[in-house]
Amino acid sequence: HFADYATAERLMLQCGFQQTPQVYDSVSDFWDRFTRRGMERDQINAMLRSIVLATAQHGDVVLLGRGCFAPLQGLCDVINVRVKAPLPLRIERVMEEHDLSKQRATRFVEEKDALVADFARTSYGLSPDDLTLFDLVIDTGKIDSDAAVRWLVEAATSLVCRPGDPTAAALKVAQVPKRAVAKEFTRRERLR
């Protein structure tokens, strides 16, 4: 399975967070909303954390999103991965992928970096630049994407869990997000 921002938004809606589309419509508005409304920020962060935990507990999933690494620290059946690349290369990739000017692509990358860092810091007190929080760090400026995928697959199939080690499978998660995750992945299976 694969879960990203769009998945998180659907799950948030299923869990009763109707303001989620407005939060996710604009990157700037998303964070403005968090800083202006502390209670709403706390509620959204708590539900996002619950969704990440429920998704990880479901198993056999790749999670892509801001701060997913934070609540999944220390679990032997989880690989926290940081994929990075030099800023000029990231800007070039965004220019090509989204057909943006260099100036707009630069602004996009810088804003996204700031948002990811702010979310991890304000939600978990962590920095995504602290590479000790990751089990594997891949620089796609040096390693091509096919090799990176092979490494990730090999790492995922080589996990070592010892008896008594904490696992995502053993997490205690809230029932509402757990049911929403199961429903989402069942829906996707039917679409295949």
Residue ranges and their predicted role:
Residues 70-76, 129-131:
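Short loop/helix-cap segments at secondary-structure boundaries that form the rim of catalytic
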Residues 6-60, 100:
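ATP-dependent small-molecule kinase phosphotransfer cores
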Residues 65:
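Divalent-cation
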Residues 45, 49, 146-149, 153:
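Short, amphipathic alpha-helical "lid/cap" segments that border enzyme active or binding sites
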Residues 74-96, 102-111:
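Conserved phosphate-donor/acceptor-positioning beta-strand/loop module used by diverse small-molecule
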Residues 29-30, 102-145, 173-190:
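Small-molecule kinase domains that catalyze NTP-dependent phosphoryl transfer to phosphate-bearing small molecules
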Residues 154-179:
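N-terminal presequence-like segments and adjacent domain-start helices
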